[in-house]
Amino acid sequence: MTDRDRAAVYAAEDQWSAALDRGGPMDFFGSHLILPVQLRFGDLAAMQAYIDARCAERGETGAVRVRPRRGQAMAHYADGVIAIPMEAGWACRESILLHEFAHHVARGDGPLHGTVFRGSMLEVVAQAQGAESALVLRTCYEANGVGHVA
């Protein structure tokens, strides 16, 4: 199955992540939003605690394990394991963990970054960071041509 939306999803999430790096008040198409500042993690234990909290919110205690990954190329999710390149500062951010956790929530239905994944991503973002953050992400998806979600 092809993953034709991958580049657009990554571009949208990069825009959203940059907004989270700043956080705080934001004028958003005439509305006043307050975005959270995204968390940055210093070690694997903090990442695991964060993912454990996301799992607990969904009633899935211990469902996902976080482990280090060699290199700096990319984070990855497969079979209940999130692999994070710890040497890469970009990978130790909340937006990356939420992206990989959304793969778990999507359960592999459809293309890796298709409508089911994007719907799952919006769901976990709303739960972890609030409706404002999810709204900004949804708008970034729209701006990058991948606004349709399942």
Identify the residue ranges that each predicted region occupies.
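Active-site-proximal or metal-binding-adjacent scaffold patches in catalytic folds
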Residues: 1-95, 104-150
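Walker B catalytic acidic pair
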Residues: 100
